[in-house]
Structure formats: structure tokens, C-alpha cells
Amino acid sequence: MAEAAEPASALPLSGSLFTHHPGPPHIMSAVICGSLAYDTIMVFQDQFKNHILPDQMHILNVSFLVPAMRREFGGCAGNIAYNLKLLGGDPLPVAAVGQDFAPYRRHMEQCGIRLDGVRQFDDQFTPQCFITTDLDNNQITAFHPGAMSSAQENHVRDIPQVDFAIVAPDGRQAMLQHVDEFAARGVPFIFDPGQAMPLFNGDEFRSMIEKSTYVIVNDYESQLLQTRTGWDTAEIAEKVSAYIVTHGPRGSVIHVGNETHAIPPARERRIVDPTGCGDAYRAGLMFAIMRGEDWPTAGRMASLMGALKVEHPGTQNQHFTYAEFAAEFRDQFGYALD
């Protein structure tokens, strides 16, 4: 793991809209716009290449026996909310779900996560992803958006108290609408286009960035965003309070005005499943911003959340308390959270 390049306590949280709250977690309400989805994950005990003939792709018709299968609770809104709750936050997912939501509802209720922002459409299914992985870790994925196609019927303008928010991947119209409504209310929020990148053109991206408080993408998405908008990293950064770019196992970079904070990756004890690490990172970042942490600390908190997630299968199966998180943070980065 790369060593911390700068003492976190020495740098201010430029662009923060929140007062620093030392001591135990200061609970603030965070609205999480995005999807709640089921992830059905299957493992094919062979290699796809042994069953697909390259010269017969025009008549592709294959079937794979998958003796191993598991169903996980997922979706960006669900994953972020789950991780934020672990830290002691108060997440409110805003999402559209379908007639089969009951098991997920019970899971959220058991976690103590509020569901008054979740709207159920009984004539549709909850969004779901079907992933088949072979022994080379190649994947064939099918995604059914289901009720997510009606997510624009959820209006964040009607939520009575919102301290902070994130607009994560969701239905196209819902994302445009939620950005507009948060901006109109003056609510600070993170714009997280993620897998929804193909849904928007350059004009739409430029408009959403200019209305956002923060923007977060991974390194590949950052290149796409620059291509679509015609803006380079510095130009995007000057339009928001912070522009965060994650680089997987290489850490992340937080651009704040003319400042650049290189965030080292946290150490993981074992690598089990990277799925959902980005959502865990976002939860850690949101929690740190709401606590008024400086950017180097915020980035490290986010990085540690991602590392703790990678040690477990699925996206919502890790368990720890804030005290355990804070102790691990001190062990890894050499200083204590206030």
C-alpha cells in the first residue's frame, strides 16, 4: 500500500458546506437516489471460450449449466444506504421497486433503514441483474430495469428535510429530475453518473455538473465525461466544490479547485469480491463530508470503506460498528478520527 503523502489534519476541507463534528458520529439525513436491485450471481464451472465458436457468432445459441448460484441485495442506492448506516448515518433511499420487493424490504427494515422514499409499482418487477461468471472471471450479464423505468415518479422536492444527497445511477429521466430538484432547493449533493454514463449527451452532462456540488466517477468514466463535455479535469473541478476520481486498487484523487489530493488505497486482509466497492467508497465519502472532515481524511475514510467491502462476498454482507471502523482507520493511516 502506498504511504499517506500528506498529514490529513493539516489540510482544510475546501468546498465543504458542513461544520466539523468531532467525537461520535453526528447523525444527519442523507437522501440516496438510485436503484434497489436484486443481483443473481451464477458460476459456470468452465470457460466460456470452450463453448462459443468464434466463426458461428451469427447463430449463437448456447446454454450453461450453473450449479452454484446466489441472490444478493444490490443496486447503488441500496449499497450506499447500507454502508452509510454501518457508519451511523441516517440514509433515506429514494428508488422505484416492483411487486417482488418484499424480501429486500425485510432486509432494509432489519438494518434500520427508512423506506418512506421507496415507491412500489405492483405491475412491474424490482430491477435485477443476472450475472454468469466463468472460471476466467469473464462475465455475461443481463439487466432488467423493471420499476426503475418509473423512478421519475419519485420527487425529491417533496422530502421534508434533506441535509445532503447523492444522485447515483438510476432511470435517465429520474436522474435529470433529481439533479434539478436538489439544485432548486439548494441541497448539496454528489452527482454520480456511473453505469448511466451512456444515457446522457454533452449538453446534459455540462448542465448536471454545473448544478452539482460534487462529482464522482472512476478513472474510465472520467475519460468518458471529459470526452462528452469537452472539459478537462481542471475545468470540471472548477465548476464544483470537489471532483473525485477513483482508481480502484491504486487509490483515488480528489480535485478541489487548484489543489489535488492523492488518496492511498486502504489495505484489505483478503480479496473476496470487488462488487460494490465503489458504492462503499461513496458512503464513506458522504459520511466524511457530512462530518466536515478535511479532504485527505474524507478520502481515506472512503478508501477504507471500499477495502472492508472487498473482504466479503456480495455488496451488503459486511458488518462492523463505527468504533471498529475508527480503530481500523487509526491502524491503517496512523492517526485517529476526531
Annotate each language-model stretch with its function.
Residues M1-H26:
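Intrinsic disorder/low-complexity segments
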Residues D116-F121, C129-Q173:
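Conserved phosphate-binding/catalytic loop of the ribokinase/pfkB sugar-kinase fold
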Residues H20, H26-L92, P103, A336-D338:
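Glycine-rich phosphate/adenosyl-contacting loop at the front of the ribokinase-like
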Residues D90-D116:
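A glycine-rich beta-to-alpha transition motif near the start of alpha/beta enzyme domains, typified by
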